Design a protein with these regions (language model features):
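Glycine/proline-enriched, intrinsically flexible loops and inter-domain linkers
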Residues: 1-199
Length: 199
């Protein structure tokens, strides 16, 4: 049954599956795992869980520490206002009017860029020069880069933007699923950028 002020369960299930499948198809990955969770605590809408798993040979993965003088490179999609507040938005109480307000908090997907990142990170010659990396999920630059080193200097004016007019706070907190921050040694910057340009 549909609770007053909430979207119908049938619409949620169909649209969630359609969106998940569409994005997976665009990046060339099989979306093989989707699960619906039925529980009294999910009475307004059932929980939909989807996952795509990645694997790499152990020799291609390293976990190193960042050292003074190392460089952090941002790559992938550009920053915009569409990714501001996504993490907090997912925790809000929603109703039928939420889509007109909360849609702006969710970063607009860019599947071709995501696919390029996947191809780049699959190359062992690339992964071997990455000391650490992080994605731009919840929290954007402020979290993704903040977790990479104990102390650092971030130049927000160098963050690639979708358009002009973004202030420092917007640049710092905008989220994206198609951006990564990588730590490389200064001597590897040119090599890494060359590999990235090939994608």
């Amino acid at each position: 049954d549909t609770i007053e002020g909430k979207l119908p369960q049938k619409k949620i299930v169909r649209e969630a599956a359609r969106g998940y499948s569409s994005y997976g198809n665009q990046i060339g990955l099989a979306t093989g795992y989707v699960k619906e969770v039925y529980h009294p605590d999910y009475v307004a809408k059932r929980m939909e869980i989807g996952a795509v798993m990645g694997a790499a040979p152990r020799r291609a993965v390293q976990r190193l520490t960042s050292d003074p003088g190392d460089k952090i490179i941002l790559l992938g999609g550009r920053t915009g206002r569409d990714g501001i507040g996504g993490a907090t938005g997912s925790s809000k109480a929603h109703n039928t009017q939420s889509t007109s307000v909360c849609g702006a908090e969710v970063q607009k997907g860019n599947a071709p860029t995501e696919r390029k990142l996947q191809r780049l990170f699959r190359r062992e010659e690339v992964s071997h020069i990455i000391k650490k990396c992080n994605d731009f999920g919840a929290g954007g630059v402020s979290v993704a880069i903040g977790e990479l080193a104990d102390g650092l200097r971030v130049q927000l004016d160098k963050v690639p933007k979708k358009y002009a007019g973004l202030d420092g706070t917007e640049l710092a907190i905008s989220e994206s699923q198609e951006r990564m921050a990588v730590v490389v040694s200064p001597s590897d910057v040119k090599t890494f950028l060359g590999y990235a340009a090939e994608e």
